[in-house]
Curated annotation (Swiss-Prot):
Name used for this protein in its record: DNA ligase
Protein species of origin: Photorhabdus laumondii subsp. laumondii (strain DSM 15139 / CIP 105565 / TT01)
Residues reported to bind Zn(2+): C408, C411, C426, C432
The keyword Membrane belongs to this UniProt entry's keyword annotation: no
Enzyme Commission (EC) number: 6.5.1.2
SMART domains, per the entry: BRCT (SM00292), HhH1 (SM00278), LIGANc (SM00532)
PROSITE patterns: BRCT, DNA_LIGASE_N1, DNA_LIGASE_N2
Keywords: DNA damage, DNA repair, DNA replication, Ligase, Magnesium, Manganese, Metal-binding, NAD, Zinc
Function: DNA ligase that catalyzes the formation of phosphodiester linkages between 5'-phosphoryl and 3'-hydroxyl groups in double-stranded DNA using NAD as a coenzyme and as the energy source for the reaction. It is essential for DNA replication and repair of damaged DNA.
The organism's place on the tree of life at top rank: Bacteria
Active-site residue list: K115
InterPro entries attached to this UniProt entry: BRCT_dom, BRCT_dom_sf, DisA/LigA_HHH, DNA_ligase, DNA_ligase_AS, DNA_ligase_CS, DNAligase_adenylation, DNAligase_N
Gene transcribed to yield this protein: ligA
Organism classification: Bacteria, Pseudomonadati, Pseudomonadota, Gammaproteobacteria, Enterobacterales
Length: 672
C-alpha cells in the first residue's frame, strides 16, 4: 500500500507540474495524449484504492453533484470596483490627484495590466488547498461557485512552492477566449441551444451552471490580479512582485504587465495594448493602472466603492449620430434621479441603441442638450450608451428645453440636490417604490435591525407580490402569508416572524442606521445617537445643531435634515415607533469632544467574541466616551480590543505594532 500511495502522489505531482507548464507558463513539455495517459493511470489507481483519493487530486476537478441553488458568500473584505478614465487628459488628472494626496511632485511607479472583460471571482486557499470560490456579486455578497471553479484547468486546486500563507484569498477574472466562444456558439447553433451574445456573457453563464459537469465542458480561462484575505504569511511590498509570486505558486498571470515610472510610459503602454487588442485572443476593455507600492496604496485608501490607488483606463468606444426624441427620468435603487434620452434607434458597436444615460442635470447643461437635438452617442466602456456631444447646427426650431423634475416621478417625494453634488436624489427612501427593495434589504441587514432569516430573495418576493411597501409592513407579516413564498415552509415562516418580533427591541444607533439616511453609516449613526439621545430631538435638529456632532459635516447634516422633514418618511417612522413598537434602552447623552476618557479621540477596532458585553453595547459605550469605532485595522487605528478567538485583525494589529487590550481591560477603562 505504501508504494501504491507513493506512486499515486508521484502521478499527482507530475500532472500538477504539467498543468502549471500548460496553463501558467504556456510552455507544455509533453503532448496532450501523454497528459491524458498519465491522468488515466491516476484515475485507474484511485478507482482501485478509493481510500487514497484526496480533494486536491487532479482527478477531482469534476464530480460534485448538481446544486439546487447557489449559497450566498459574504466577502470578508469587499470586492470593490474601479473608477474609470476614458482619455489621456482624464488619466493625467487621476495621476495628479494621487500625487497631490501623497504630496508627491514626481511621477509615481505604477503597475499596468489588462482589464479583462470577464467575471471577477474570489479563490480562497487554506494551507495551499482551494477550499472555496465565489463570484464578486455586489462586492459585499457573492455566490459560492466552488464546484464550477474546480473544473477550470487553469486554476490550481493546490498551490505549490514556498512561503504559501495559511489562508489567502486570490482574486482574478474568469473569461472565455474568443476561439472557445466561437466554437461554443457554433455548437449551440447546430443543436438549437442558446447562443451567447459575447464571451463575457458566455463566461458568466458557464460559471452559474448548477451542474458543474456543464461548466467543465466550457472553454474557460483565468488570470489572477490581486489578493483579499491574507493570514499566516507575508507577501512582497509591491503589486508587481506579488504577481510574480502568484505565478510561482502556480496561478496564471497575464504576461501583458508593465511597471511604469512616469505617466507617459503608462500612456504608451495603453496605446500599445489598443494596437494589440484584436490579436490577444480574448476580450479586454482597457488597461488597469495601480500604484505599485502597497504602502502607498494603504495611505491612499478608498473612496465610496473604489480604491483611490487604481483606475481603469478604458478604450474609446464607437460613436454614432442620432436624434433625441424625449428625455425621461428614472429613479435608481438608491434614489438617484437619472435623466435618460429616448433616441431614434441607431446601431453602435453592433448593438441597437434606443436609450442613453444623461447622468445628471449638470451633464444636460454642459451638453446644452434639448429634446429634438441631433447628438453623438458613444457606448462608454462598450457597455452603457451615453450622449457625448450635441450638433447644435442641426437643432430644429421646435426643440424643447429639458426640465428637471422637483418631485420624484415614482413616489412624489421631494427631490434633493446638495450644493456641490452632481446627483439629485429622491428623499422618500422609506416609501419610494423604486428604492423599496434596496431600502428593505438594508433595514433588515445584520448591522441594522438584524432580522435573522430575512434574506434578499424573501425581500424580492415580498415586494413583487406587494405584501410589503414600507419597513413597518414587515412587522405585520404573518406566518401564513410568508408560507406562500417560494422555499418557505411553516417552520421557516414562523422563524422569520419570531425574528421580526425580536428585532423590535434594538438600539437607537441601529435604528438610525437602518433608516438608510444618505451618508449615515454605522459610526455616524452611533455618534448621532450618543449626541442627541432621543429620536424627537434628532428629528427637530437643524443643520447647525447637527454639525456639532463628531464626524458630521455640512453635507451629512443636509441629508439628515432633508430626510426627517420629508412627510412620507415621517409617517413611516411614526408607524414604526407608535404602531409597531420599535423601542430601545434610553441613551446616555454625551458630547464626545468634551469627554476626558482613555478612549476620547481614539480610533478603535473590536475583534473576536466578547462575553461581558454584546458588541453593540461595547460600541455604544466606546462611542459615548469619544471613540470612533471602525471595522478594519490600519495605520490609523489607535487601539484594538481583542475578545476570544480574535483572528486576522489581531494579527494585523500585531504586525503594525498597534496597542491591543482584552475585554477585561476594556471594562476597566470604561469605568474610569
Amino acid at each position: 500500500m505504501k508504494s501504491t500511495a507513493q506512486q499515486i502522489e508521484k502521478l499527482r505531482t507530475t500532472l500538477r507540474h504539467h498543468e502549471y507548464l500548460y496553463h501558467v507558463m504556456d510552455a507544455p513539455e509533453i503532448p496532450d495524449a501523454e497528459y491524458d495517459r498519465l491522468m488515466q493511470e491516476l484515475q485507474d489507481l484511485e478507482e482501485q484504492y478509493p481510500e487514497l483519493i484526496t480533494s486536491d487530486s487532479p482527478t477531482q476537478r469534476i464530480g460534485a453533484a448538481p446544486l439546487a441553488a447557489f449559497e450566498q458568500v459574504r466577502h470578508e473584505i469587499p470586492m470593490l470596483s474601479l473608477d474609470n478614465v476614458f482619455d489621456e487628459e482624464s488619466y493625467l488628472a487621476f495621476d495628479k490627484r494621487v500625487r497631490d494626496r501623497l504630496k508627491e511632485t514626481q511621477d509615481l511607479v505604477v503597475c499596468c495590466e489588462l482589464k479583462l472583460d470577464g467575471l471577477a471571482v474570489s479563490l480562497l486557499y487554506e494551507n495551499g488547498e482551494l477550499v472555496r470560490a465565489a463570484t464578486r456579486g455586489d462586492g459585499t455578497t457573492g455566490e459560492n461557485i466552488t464546484s464550477n471553479i474546480r473544473t477550470i484547468g487553469a486554476i490550481p486546486l493546490r498551490l505549490f512552492g514556498e512561503n504559501i500563507p495559511a489562508r489567502i484569498e486570490i482574486r482574478g477574472e474568469v473569461f472565455m477566449p474568443q476561439k472557445g466562444f466561437e466554437k461554443l456558439n457554433e455548437e449551440a447553433r447546430r443543436t438549437g441551444a442558446k447562443v451567447f451574445a459575447n464571451p463575457r456573457n458566455a463566461a458568466a453563464g458557464s460559471l452559474r451552471q448548477l451542474d458543474p459537469r456543464i461548466t467543465a465542458k466550457r472553454p474557460l480561462a483565468f488570470f489572477c490580479y490581486g489578493v483579499g484575505i491574507l493570514e499566516g504569511g507575508e507577501l512582497p511590498a509591491s503589486h508587481y512582485e506579488r504577481l510574480i509570486q502568484f505565478k510561482k505558486w502556480g496561478l496564471p498571470v497575464s504576461d501583458k504587465v508593465k511597471v511604469c515610472t512616469d505617466s507617459q510610459q503608462v500612456i504608451d503602454f495603453y496605446h500599445d495594448i489598443v494596437n494589440q487588442r484584436s490579436a490577444l485572443g480574448f476580450d479586454i476593455d482597457g488597461v488597469v493602472v495601480k500604484i505599485n507600492s502597497l504602502e502607498l496604496q494603504e495611505i491612499l485608501g478608498f473612496v465610496a466603492r473604489a480604491p483611490r490607488w487604481a483606475t481603469a483606463f478604458k478604450f474609446p468606444a464607437q460613436e454614432q449620430m442620432t436624434i433625441v426624441r424625449d428625455v425621461e427620468f428614472q429613479v435608481g435603487r438608491t434614489g438617484a434621479i437619472t435623466p435618460v434620452a429616448r433616441l431614434e434607434p441607431v446601431q453602435v458597436s453592433g448593438v441597437i441603441v434606443s436609450n442613453a444615460t444623461l447622468h445628471n442635470a449638470d451633464e444636460i447643461e454642459r451638453l446644452g442638450l434639448r429634446i429634438g437635438d441631433t447628438v453623438i452617442i458613444r457606448r462608454a466602456g462598450d457597455v452603457i450608451p451615453q450622449v457625448v456631444g450635441v450638433l447644435e447646427e442641426r437643432r430644429p426650431q421646435d426643440s424643447n428645453v429639458v426640465v428637471f423634475p422637483e418631485h420624484c416621478p415614482v413616489c412624489g417625494a421631494d427631490i434633493e440636490r446638495i450644493e456641490g453634488e452632481a446627483v439629485a436624489r429622491c428623499t422618500g427612501g422609506l416609501v419610494c417604490g423604486a428604492q423599496r427593495k434596496e431600502a428593505l434589504r438594508h433595514f433588515v441587514s445584520r448591522r441594522a435591525m438584524d432580522v435573522d432569516g430575512m434574506g434578499e430573495k424573501i425581500i424580492d418576493q415580498l415586494v413583487d407580490k406587494e405584501y410589503v411597501k414600507t419597513p413597518a409592513d414587515l412587522f405585520r407579516l404573518t406566518a401564513g402569508k410568508l408560507t406562500g413564498l417560494d422555499r418557505m415552509g411553516p417552520k421557516s415562516a414562523q422563524n422569520v416572524v419570531d425574528a421580526l418580533e425580536k428585532a423590535k427591541k434594538t438600539t437607537f444607533a441601529r435604528f438610525l442606521y437602518a433608516l438608510g439616511i444618505r451618508e449615515v453609516g454605522e459610526a455616524t449613526a452611533a455618534n448621532l445617537a450618543a449626541h442627541f439621545g432621543e429620536l424627537d430631538k434628532l428629528r427637530s435638529a437643524d443643520e447647525e445643531a447637527l454639525k456639532e456632532v463628531q464626524d458630521v459635516g455640512e453635507v451629512v447634516a443636509k441629508h439628515v435634515v432633508n430626510f426627517f422633514i420629508e412627510p412620507h418618511n415621517q409617517t413611516v417612522i411614526d408607524d414604526l415607533i407608535d404602531d409597531i413598537g420599535i423601542n430601545w434602552e434610553p441613551v446616555v447623552v454625551t458630547r464626545a469632544e468634551k469627554i476626558d476618557s482613555p478612549f476620547s479621540g481614539k480610533t478603535v477596532v473590536l475583534t473576536g467574541s466578547l462575553h461581558q458585553l454584546s458588541r453593540d453595547e461595547a460600541k455604544a459605550k466606546l462611542v459615548a466616551l469619544g471613540a470612533k469605532v471602525t471595522g478594519s485595522v490600519s495605520k490609523k487605528t489607535d487601539l484594538v480590543i481583542a475578545g476570544e478567538a480574535a483572528g486576522s485583525k489581531l494579527a494585523k494589529a500585531n504586525e503594525l505594532n498597534i496597542p491591543v487590550i482584552d475585554e477585561e481591560e476594556m471594562i476597566r477603562l470604561l469605568g474610569e
